[in-house]
Amino acid sequence: YTYPFWWESFRPYLYQNCTPEKKTYDLIIIGSGYTGISSAIEACSQNLKTLLIDQSALGEGASTRSAGMVSGGLNLGKKINLFQEYGNQIATDFIRESIDSYRFLEDQINGHHNDVKYQKTGRLVLAHSKKKVEALKKKTELLNSLTNLKLEFLKDVNHEISNDYYKGGMLVHDAASIHPSLFYKFLLNKALRCKLDIF
């Protein structure tokens, strides 16, 4: 059995602090990944009596296994055209909400960048064909018209990456890396300071 590289810094563990039988809760959350534990922290901040349930070690699933590259608004609509599927207003709202989630993350870890190994790295999205270059150029223009991401379309990417393969790219300044397991530890410590029942 092998475990993820990220667990060398923090390994998920089994934890219970209650026996929930015959108790009443305002909210029961099933699953203790990023979504579950973040929801539990928010619920506790609103004085909701909350129970967080997980059958496995806390954060053992995808949250502490996936590479920690973060940005907002870039990957929406990979499989479908959001604007055709949902219309202009809802598609625009999706994109802006995604960007807001990135800002929310930055607010949550403010003052704790070293604890979670958060670094503003930027991101380079590359295109390998003329068709992909045109699509990326349109995406850059669209996102710049809807947001304040200040994305840069690059006809020549050789000053970013030495290659003979890629025909163009999009430079994203507002992107970062975070250590997924240490970020989970940060959230877990926050949750354990709340009046939160975990089973």
Residues covered by each model-derived region:
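Helical element adjacent to the flavin cofactor pocket in flavoenzyme catalytic cores
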Residues: 134, 141-142, 165-199
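A conserved short coil-to-beta-strand element within the FAD-binding core of flavoproteins
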Residues: 154-163, 197-199
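Extreme N-terminal leader/targeting segments of oxidoreductases
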Residues: 1-27, 45
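N-terminal Rossmann-like FAD-binding beta1-loop-alpha1 element of flavoenzymes
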Residues: 24-52
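Dinucleotide-binding Rossmann-like beta1-alpha1 core, especially the glycine-rich loop
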Residues: 73-156
